[in-house]
Amino acid sequence: METVGVLCARARVEEKSLMAALAAAGIVSAIFPPVDEPLPVGPLAIAPSGNPFPVPRLVIDRHQDRQIARAVLASCRALGVPALSAGVAATGDRLDVASALAAHGLPRPHSALCTSEEAALKAVRFSGLPATLMPLDMKSGGIALLDQDTAEAVLEHRAVLGGSERSLGLIQAGAPTAHQRAEIIVIDGRATALEPGSDLACGPVERRMAEEAARALRADLVAVTVARIGSEPIVWDVHPAPDFRDAMPIAVLTVAEAVAHAVAQRLRTMDAASLAQDLGSWIAITPEGVHDDIVIRA
């Protein structure tokens, strides 16, 4: 099926505008995976029902449920279907993201992984207040810990709820307000738009930092939160499937148009690679075939 799949549960305003931009670029798209079709497990494109599975050429990750997104992206990899996604942020958690950004040398707030209430309180005392509790799952926002009473109440509440999901988290130094941060959407390596509510002045330094963060995460489509708590900007957080209905374009293209442009480029690259492979096979076979087929008769 020569179709680009838009990975989502339903088409919201963002996905509808994205599919319209793809159509304007001459690219057929559809919601993926089909709601009524189970996905195959493994490299064969045969659904568990026995029917051929509608495999798209490329998938755009827009799913708001990151657990479902990770599972579907894994299935796509098994089928050999590339994805336009947030890279490490699409398939990992905040610890994976923080580790990748730190390994790349990008400026980040002091962070500590905590596995218990006691460890989190110790991390808060070490980093100082205010601080922010960042759940490991990408779908949950950070919780500002503005004073000691708030920190103890929040961490105790999570401990009482129980479970490893509630116990695990990152404590990050600082708690930037709206006017101290900017949400920059990076598409195919370029800062493309600002999410609404981004009050921090977004200059060349912030845009370059967001682009560098996207490269560190191997992300094609991601929102990077750049914060300025002190004198220098830092990478605060990322969002693998950002809302962009009210996003303000930095240049000419809207987010939907920029994604459609990136998809068109990716499809052209895939076509060129496929053609080169076919030509290579033809060149490798032809000389032997020509010599074998020549017959000289007296």
Which residue ranges define each predicted feature?
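ATP-grasp fold ATP-binding core
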Residues: 98-102, 124-145, 163-177
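Extreme N-terminal starter segment of soluble prokaryotic enzymes
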Residues: 1-5
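A long amphipathic alpha-helix within ATP-dependent nucleotide-binding catalytic cores
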Residues: 194-235, 239, 243, 247-249, ...
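Conserved N-proximal alpha/beta basic substrate-recognition cap immediately N-terminal to
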Residues: 9-111
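Phosphate-binding site of ATP-dependent enzymes
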Residues: 144-217
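Structural detector of well-ordered beta-strand residues that form the stable sheet scaffold
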Residues: 83-84, 109, 132, 170-172, ...
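Short hydrophobic segments within beta-strands
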Residues: 7-8, 187
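Rossmann-like NAD(P)H-binding beta-loop-alpha module
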Residues: 109-131
